[in-house]
């Protein structure tokens, strides 16, 4: 909460008096459902309205400041999709480099079932492990592939300097990138194919489980039960 006030002050807001707040939420905590981002976005929005001179920030600006509040202020690992998705609402495609670009999508996805395994996860550890390993891999690859660009690089890269473990992690990154591109193509259609979206979700989960090791036996049991009950696909959140 203090970081949110600091971020808002850096953005030009001033607060000449204090205030008392009570927060209630039904979002599961530490369950991959963006509970912290929901609080950050709501907090920034509240601060923008309660300031001495209220700010008329739009949803994108609130998402940007929520990201700074949660990630940049603490130098934590993590992307910005949770903050922008929560602030913008509905479904978005977010591209974070070379510049931030947000595309609002409005597909007819139908119902989703969100299951809570009630197993707490160490989000920061998972994100840090994956981020640090990827950064090291990218630095190694640039030695033999000076024009490396993760958004378009293909099978022509020289992976000689990578260990087998690093090759697996890099290929997982490429697979996830390709799954995202395939999903975007489908989601932009007037009539999307729900079976394709379901398969893409499951394929993504397979990468997360088998290569990034972020699933658990209980979540796998829940996934199997959902698929056996007729779900078109599914994946772990967070």
Identify the role of each PLM range.
Residues 1-107, 227-228:
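Gly/Ser-rich oxyanion-binding loop with an adjacent helix/lid
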Residues 85, 90-235:
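C-terminal nucleotide
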